[in-house]
Every structure is written in C-alpha cells, then in structure tokens.
C-alpha cells in the first residue's frame, strides 16, 4: 500500500499535523487519502485521542470504514467504526470513526469540546456541501474557544486553495500529485432533433462497441438514469450488465454498482454526480459524461426547493474524466462541444449559497450563535435565505425573539429537519410518538414509483423506515407505542400547516394555506379529495404551481376539532358601496384558505366601526365628507408641523391619518351604524377634538383661520400643502397697513392677493411696503380711470382704509 501516491507526502503531512492546528491536503481521487492515509495518521501521527473522519455520503462512509478495517485485518466496530443515520458500528476500542455529515454536527452540539477527539478530518471538502461548510465553521470555533489542541485536516481532490488559504492563512498546504493514467477526452454534441435519453444511449453503445472495458455513465438524475437504462438495454451485448447508482437507492443496490463486474462480463454504471469523487468504482476504463447535473435551488419567496438541470463546471468535467484513468489509459466522452466545455464555469456553486437554511439556522442558534457572521465561513450564508429560515422557525414556534424557545431547544436536540423536528416534538404519548417517528422516516426517504398517497406509504412495513423510526423513538424517550393512522393529520399539521391544500376548480389543482398554488398529476387518485396536507412539494420550473409529491387526504373539519389552534375565526363586516349597506359574516380560515363562512345577523357596534375603518383604509380618505373647513384644518396642522416644529403636532398626511383612524375618527363614531351616517360625520370636528387643548389654542393663535384687516373685516386665510398661506382682500381695505402681515410667531409672511373693487387680482405680493412704494403707482394710474368712484391715494400706507366709495368715505 505504500506505493499509493499519498504515501510520498506522508512525512510532510505528519510534520504539519504536529506543528499546525489546521492542515490542507490536495490529493486526486485514488491517491489513498481516504482508504489508507487515516490509518497511517492513527499509527504515526501522535494524535492525542480518537480520529473522526467525515465522509459526505453514507455509502462512501461505510465503504471507507470497511476498507480501513480490512487493512487492519479486522471488522468494522473494532479499531475502525462508523456512524451514520439509522446505523452505528463502533466499539469500546474504536479509535477511528468514519461519520456522515449530520452525525458530526450532532457530536459537536452534544459535546462542544469533542472530548476524547484529537483530530477531525473533512474528506471530499471540494464538494462544498452545506453540512461540510457548517462543520468547518463549528470546528474552527471549537479550536478558537475551547480546544486549541484539536487538529483539523481538510482533504479534497480539487481544493479551492486560494479561498481556503484566505480563511486559514497559517495552514500548511500539502499537495499529492496522485497517480493517473492518460485519459483521452473527446467531445460530441448531442443531435438537437433526438431525445436526450435516446441520444445518450446511442453514444454510449457506440463507445462500448468500439472500446473494451467497463463504463461509467454520468446523468443528471434518476429519471434520466431509468430512461437511458431502458434504451441502452436494447443496444448492448449480453455480456454487459447495467447498474444504476444514485443516493436514494438502498445501500445494497449501491454496493452492487461499485463492485467489479463478474469474470467475463462488462459493466455500465449509470450514475448521478454521486460517483464523481467520493466512491471508487472498480474496473472503469470508459466514461460518458452528459455534462449535466441536477441541483436543488431554494426559493426564499416560496419557501420551496426546485430542481434545476444545468451544465456542470469545468472542475466537475475534469473529475468525471479522471474516473477513466484510475487503472489504465482510458477514454472520456463529453456529450457537448469543446467550445461549450471551455465556456463552462470554473467551479460549481456551493450549497450554502442556494439551499434552504432553516436547519443551518437551527444548528447555529443551538450553538449560541445568533449572527452567522460571528463564525468563519468560506461563503457567508445569504441574508435572504436566512430571513426565510427565520420566518419558518418562527412559524414553528421555535424562536423567542432572536433565541431558541424551549420548544425550539427540544427541536434542535433531535437533529432533524426543523419541520420534522416540530412534528416529532408534538408527540404527547407513545402511540403519537411512534406515528410521528414513522412519518419522519418516510419523509426523510420518500417512496419512489409515483404514488403520492402518504397513507398508502404509512401502511407499508418497509425495513429502512422501521429501523429509522425505532432510532427516532429512542431519541424521543418513548417505548412500545404503535403507529396510529388516525393521528397522522394532526401531527402533519403541527409542522406543515402552511401546506394544507384546498382543491380549486381544475382537476388536480390546489391552493395552499400559504397562498401558493400546487398540483397533482391529472390522473392522480388523490385529486378527488377536496382537502389535503402536502408535506412534500417541489417547485416546478415550467409552472408557477408547486408539484405535490406526497400528500394525505384529510377531513378538514375533524382536523380543526383535533387542532383548534390551526383555525383563525374572525367576524367580518364589509361595506357594499353599490347598495350603501354593510354586510357581516363569521369566517373560519387556515392561513389564506377559507374553511367556512356564516352570516352574522347582528354585528356589534365595535365590529361595524372596525369594518368602516377597514373600508376607509382600503378606499382612502376621500370616502369621508371633507368640507372646505375640514380640509383647511388639516392643512393648518400640516403647516404647523413645518413652521412650529418645537410642538408635537400630529401627522396629517393621508397615510398617517389612515393609520391613526382609531385615535381621531373612531371617538366621533358613536351611533354611526350606516354608510350614510358615516358620510355625514363632521370630519373637522373629529380632527379638532383629536388635538389636546393647548395645541388647539396654539393653532388658533398662530395659524388662525382668519386675519383681521385694517377695516376690521375678518378675511379667511387660505392654507396650502406646499405654497405659502394666502389672503385675498380688496386693496382699499389694506390702506394704512405699512408691512406684510405674518403668522406662526412672525415666521411666515402671508401672500397678499390685492383685489380690485370687482374682486379681481391686481397684485400678488409678500412685501406690502415695497409694493406701496413701487409698482402701486402703475396700479393707481390704471384703477383711477377704471374705478373713479373709489379711493386711490398717493400714500396708501398712511391713508385710512375703507370698504366704501368716495361718496361715503
């Protein structure tokens, strides 16, 4: 084994681990970094404590553990063990544990010091899974605050060294060149006129005919694997075995795909990107790369994940091609043009930038970290997705302010997806716990085959579900319960209330309680049910409606009886403007879904008034009768806030008045029971009564409604939103006034509109004194001829004012 490529850098690596808290190892697939190196570190690395080796996938974790144990002549559970969901194989003498991602996070949460652990190894880190990024952030925090003696080794086939070195500038970088045979890389664009699965099968069959050896065929998803397998089966010889390989396959089926082909046989492994790096598949010499992958992208707006088929990065193409050169010179056929390959992105996007972050946020809050920026990340979790995660945790009653509630702490301790954790913690006895545990097991590994009826899946006795349910029952500290189909709906509603669905007019179309649309296949038998709970949804790319993958028919009225808190009852009164009347009814809702509506014979005055206020807010203040006096009062208050800002004037713009209807309008509405009475309401009086007495006095003295001119006439002042206040007065009544009158403690001059005897404007001025001494002369000349019976003095500033003609002056 010492001939493995990574053996050449072992002394350098051991030295780095002795002297540095973090070490980066870059070693290509097949170099021995997973299946040989950990044993050498265990034997020679002077590690003080156990070694934890993180593998991103369950199959890889089990295979690595078995291989390491074989090298020691042992079985897993002795020196080398493994831990994964629903399966643990460790013993009292285990010193090297191979674990999957969620398991490592649970270990850190339960024992933040990682007592007894000397080294944590993160393998295949280039895959940048969400859990791997979280594990790195938590481990670095442990090193900084609790365990400066803990060692961390980050291993990858294609490390993003530049970014990791920015995050860990002191970490030594060890590079193993690896051992790979030459790979001839060919490029073949698929014909545009041919179906994808047909074209891929033709290209793969042709390569099999012209070359010897087994083949690894990369496809974006399970559907493509199944369809290409059908097409390829028609085209290959009898000595070729077709083996699918994807994450949802049972582990026994996955193992068949990675074992060598029987003697005299060839094998074609049809795989998703699960086979890019973390699994060693025996006997592969040929690779056909569809150059596509299917990735999950979270939509923060809908709270759903959609699957997107996209071109892979150049780094992934290189990894896929490398699979052909592990044992001998090989061939990789990329199913796209070389120019397209060269234009592909250099690296793929990490999961943390495009995933649902509710589980991550729950883990961070359990860790005591309210702000993710407090930890060290290669990529900071996006604020938009974090906000969506916070909304979900709030809806699940997991938060009190910025921290976890008592319920949230129970959820976090389980280590499940937040919705499933909420459902599990809702169990109150052994039977409901058994029901919740089985439901969680089903939703973690949903059934395949197109049956969307959750009740049918629940009735099945499937081994992996039963094993997982038993594990969850232990976590819940319940024993002996029996799953009860009658409690499924209530348990689902505790975590998926927003996914209660009501059938719309079209067949298979539903509306969810969160307002979104959802749909079943047109021929799905579930479509005959009026109400469903749909815990498993997928956001489609072709339709705005989500696709229902798994759902339960429910009796909505029985569900509300079981879970009264689900429903919101409200008495609603709305006006019918066409009829000039108010309509009242009692409405029962779950989210945005109306369950039942009943007429209300006699709503209370409070309900009537609230309906009127709601109607005003919807239609605007114009529904009230704004007399000129009411509008002028509003404008005086508006101006007072600008001119006398030292006083606490109420805001009277439309938005503010609508927001404060309960404070200024409602007190005037006693006895108002109809729209006619509402329209007769005195708005001016309502605004005036809203003002405290001192402010009312201040307003009347400093922004009066009228100004008394020299003749003693009280002339109305006109106030405006944006223009200065104006006074329209006959010029003769202003004789004897030497300067422009002011208001608001002398801060604001009035604009004088000086009128002719016929009430037509002669002059508009804000400086009366300057007008008397200046342009008045021109006005005097013209007016003497036009209105000879009126007084037009040479010195108006010192002439007695008059309302009369000369005859009566």
Q: Can you say where each PLM-predicted feature lies in the sequence?
A:
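Extended active-site and interfacial segments that coordinate phosphate-rich ligands
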Residues: 111-126, 136, 290-294, 303, ...
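P-loop NTPase motor module signature
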Residues: 1-423, 538, 722
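Generic recognition of stable, solvent-exposed alpha-helical segments in well-folded globular domains
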Residues: 12, 32, 36, 59, ...
